[in-house]
Amino acid sequence: SFDMWERRKSPYDYARYFAEWHERDLTDEILRDRNHASVFMWSIGNEVLEQWSHADATELDLQAANLILNAGHAIDPALLKDTTLSRQSLITRHLAAIVKRLDTSRVVTAGCNEVNPANHLFRSDALDVLGFNSHERYFEPFLRNFPGKKLIVSESTSALMTRGYYEMPSDHIYIRPESWDKPFEAPEHVCSSYDNCHVPWGSTHEKTWHLVKTLPHVSGLFVWTGFDYLGEPTPYWWPSRSSFFGIVDLAGFPKDVYYMYKSEWTDEPVLHIFPHWNWKEGEPVDIWAYYNNADEVEL
């Protein structure tokens, strides 16, 4: 899918070529992959700036634009009164039509971090399934805001973890950074693996997965992210070089929450007890035996 359409996120991105190449590139992608059994829907965009109904978001650099888009805002009913289609909505229809012309067996979606019904992509009525990037608090009222629509969580969670590091009490939720435009400062540059630390626009793995399991209109989710990755260091900036989002770290070792998903997504027996046992005498320790698929667990 496209990471940008006509509106650029950085000076030398695909927006320079969108007008000339979008139809050829989208066509080539679909013809290449439409016979793959793993393809169950097509996305025509990820956090494209055309979604946004506020012009300020289109004037920012890449990092600032993504962060401010993720911050979200309250739904403005006044924006819904205008029923005319914008250029952005027409582009959405155009791209969806290309997909449908080449593959009628799959649905079309787009990953959006603008969850307002005034979102130009949503207003096009060309998306079979609406994709939300984070914004878990809008999952429950989804059907009130989008009657008759379907939802997939195209990016979820954005929880922060460092394998082997634990911050207690484990039931306290740490929001880091407090503001999208300022890094969190701590000398260790680590994040708790109790699933109790996440960014302001995200949520914990447990809370997000509970919503997906219990809300019938939510079809599923993609976890942001499967692996830590170089770039977008969050919540710390330099000298951190990588994200802390993954359920697997850069060395390929699973973090604790990996076993929550394994207990939910596989039929294998799972019992994962943590944290580690390398503590000094007298230190309080919160022990979790929560990641399992047993009827009960006895320590």
Model-derived regions: residue spans:
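Extended substrate-binding grooves/exosites of carbohydrate-active enzymes
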Residues: 1-299
